[in-house]
Amino acid sequence: YPPFSYLSNDSTPTGIDVDIATEAFARMGYAVRIEIIDWEQKTKLVESGAIDCIWSCFSMDGREQLYRWAGPYMVSRQVVAVNAQSHIETLADLAGKTMMVQSTTKPEEIFLAGTDPRIPQLGEVLSTENRSVQYAMLNCGYVDAIAAHETAVLQYMQDCNANFRILEEPLLVTGIGVAFALNDTRGLDEQLTETFAAMRADGTMKQIVGKYLPNPEKYLEVDALEP
């Protein structure tokens, strides 16, 4: 999920989340082992102890009671993207259109729930397990729009020279955090939250995010999020 977590050319896990995790856990006295998982099985894996935490640009909104959370450590904008020449300019213009989202994500939840008054009745909402399918479908014109993290869309546009346009009005502005199981009583969530604060204060967060994204400050304004 670039730029947060992905494999480099030599198949080494890298990205914003990998760098933050490595630094934060090192400060707490732990070494990090990155496990690539089936995202749809994430809750079962963390509850069973197969993994210690879920960490990959994971939005906290609406999931506050499902896990013990560390963070938020960054701000995320969930957005709608269309082809540059599309006549879709606002969320209201999505009426009757075909939307593709990644399964088990906040955009899927938002569009399937149909409770956001800003969003009209769509023609169809398609879900895919593979995020890259979204981009291919939009690129080929098989869907009218996709919805995802703004940073992921921007990364794809940069890497693949895709001629997409992001709607100005975001679907959701939320914090992203690290999820631990509710039955995890080790206190790692609280320690990690404190470590995040220290890393913001000493400039480490800005340095890490700035390696991957321009204007890193806007992604670190977690204190501005509504409680």
Briefly describe each language-model feature range.
Residues 1-57, 65, 127, 191-192, ...:
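Extracytoplasmic small-molecule ligand-binding "clamshell" domains
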Residues 6-7, 21-30, 107-128, 157-161:
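Ligand-binding cleft/hinge of the Venus flytrap
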Residues 75-82, 154, 158-197, 215-227:
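Periplasmic-binding protein-like
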Residues 18-27, 88, 92-106, 178-216:
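Extended ligand-binding regions for polar small-molecule ligands
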Residues 1, 9-12, 58-60, 83-87, ...:
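Short coil/turn segments
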Residues 15, 29, 48, 64, ...:
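Extracytoplasmic
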Residues 41-44, 57-66, 110-113, 137-139, ...:
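A ligand-binding cleft/hinge motif common to bilobed small-molecule-binding domains
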Residues 41-42, 87, 106-107, 133, ...:
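Alpha-helix capping/helix-boundary segments
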